[in-house]
């Protein structure tokens, strides 16, 4: 509302964007602040690289989300910034998946079977999806990268990060022994 007020009252050039679960390579993937796609990619990569197929999922895994790949987000931001539209826009995808489905997709990408272990933990809201009607109507923007393709790109990068981290930890253990 403040941005709209400053636009209407003082002529400020403003843009308002609600981002919906943006993910991709080079994002936070470890440490507890990562989004679900990165956390799942990390857990599946650890399962693959250590041979332990168990993957922890907070809650029952039936909470739903939509996820937007970073390259689609960047294109959306460019379109928004180049427009003169100053009202709120959602930027995300409208494909809803459960966390359990997300684990299955990433496990398929990794080429492994996992055992889902549902544990108590923060789950957030039960369901959240991006309504892209307005951004589609106003700017003609649609995400172009499928969830599977975005997760494949993300998984490859995160698996490499996990491999490097495991190698560092292994070398520290052998040095201290």
Can you describe what each PLM-predicted range is?
Residues 40, 46-177:
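C-terminal substrate-binding subdomain of Rossmann-fold SDR/epimerase-dehydratase oxidoreductases
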């Amino acid at each position: 509302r403040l941005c709209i007020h400053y636009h209407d009252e003082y002529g400020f050039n403003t843009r308002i964007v609600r981002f919906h679960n943006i993910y991709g390579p080079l994002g936070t993937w470890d440490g507890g602040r990562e989004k679900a796609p990165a956390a799942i990619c990390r857990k599946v990569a650890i399962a693959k690289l250590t041979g332990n197929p168990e993957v922890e999922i907070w809650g029952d895994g039936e909470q739903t989300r939509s996820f937007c790949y970073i390259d689609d987000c960047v294109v959306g931001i460019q379109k928004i910034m180049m427009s003169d539209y100053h009202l709120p826009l959602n930027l995300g995808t409208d494909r809803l998946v459960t966390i359990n489905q997300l684990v299955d997709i990433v496990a398929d990408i990794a080429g492994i079977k996992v055992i889902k272990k549902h544990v108590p933990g923060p789950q957030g809201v039960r369901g959240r999806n991006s309504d892209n009607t307005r951004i589609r109507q106003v700017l003609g923007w649609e995400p172009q990268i499928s969830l599977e393709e975005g997760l494949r790109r993300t998984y490859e990068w995160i698996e490499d990060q996990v491999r490097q981290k495991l190698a560092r930890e292994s070398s520290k253990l052998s040095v201290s022994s």
